[in-house]
Amino acid sequence: MNKQRVTLNCDMGESFGNWKMGSDELVMPWVDMANIACGFHASDPSVMSKTVALAKHYKVKIGAHPGYQDLVGFGRRSIPHTPAQISEIVLYQVGALKAVCQYHDVPLHYVKPHGALYNDMMESEAIFRAICEAVSIFGIPLMILATSDNQHYLDIADIYDVPLLFEAFADRQYQEDGKLTPRSQANAVYHQPEDIYNQALQIATYGSVNTANGTRLSLEADTICVHGDNPESIALVQRISQAIAKM
C-alpha cells in the first residue's frame, strides 16, 4: 500500500466568455488540487480570477494548466513549436496565473500541462526539457504522468532543479508501457462510474492499474486526476474523495 494518501486533482476554470465548461463550484469541495486553465486552450482573465478565488475558499492547492493556443481544438491538437517557443508559451501562461494568485493572496503550487502539450511532453525529451526550463523560473513542481519509468524524468528534471509530481488517471485506459491509450483508440476513456471508481481505488490502495490486456502495472503516483464535467461524474468524484479519506 502507498505510505502517503494520494490526492485528487481536477482540471478547472475551462469556461470562457459566455461559454461554460464544467461545474467547478460543485467539484472544488471534493478535490485537493485544481489545475486552472490559463487562457490558451480555455479560460479568460475573469474565469481565472473566479476560479482562483473558489480554490482559495475551499483551501485547494492551485496549479497552472498551460496548453497550446487552440481554443477551437480545446488544446487537444499538437501544434509544432521549437523548444524555445514551448518555454515561452509556458512562461506566459504560468506567469499570468501566478499574477492572479498574487492578487488573491494565495500561492501557485505547481504546473500541469494540458492535453496535447502534456502528451507531447511525455513523448519528447526536448519538449519536457523546455517545460522544465520554464517551470524552474517559478520554483514549483511540475506534474507529469506516472509511468513504469519515473526515474528517467526525475533525472532530467533534477538538472533544472524542478521537483516532479506524478499523477495517474482514474478514467483512462493504460497501455503495457504505462502510457495512456490514445483517445483515438476504442476504450481509451472509461465512462462507466464503477470502472472509474475501481481504478481510482486501486491506484490509491495498491499503486497499480490493470492495463488494456489485463496485466497489473505498478505506478508510483502522488495524485489521481478526476473529472467533474456532468452531474454523474461530480457524484463520482465525491464518492472517490470520501473513500480515499477513509484510508
UniProtKB/Swiss-Prot annotation:
Reaction catalysed?
5-oxo-L-proline + ATP + 2 H2O = L-glutamate + ADP + phosphate + H(+)
Q: Which Gene3D superfamilies match?
A: Glycoside hydrolase/deacetylase (3.20.20.370)
The keyword ATP-binding appears for this protein: yes
Name the enzyme group at the top EC level: hydrolase
- Reading the lineage from the top rank, the first entry is Bacteria
Give the NCBIfam families listed for this entry.
PRK05406.1-3, PRK05406.1-5
Q: List the protein's name.
A: 5-oxoprolinase subunit A
- Source species: Vibrio vulnificus (strain CMCP6)
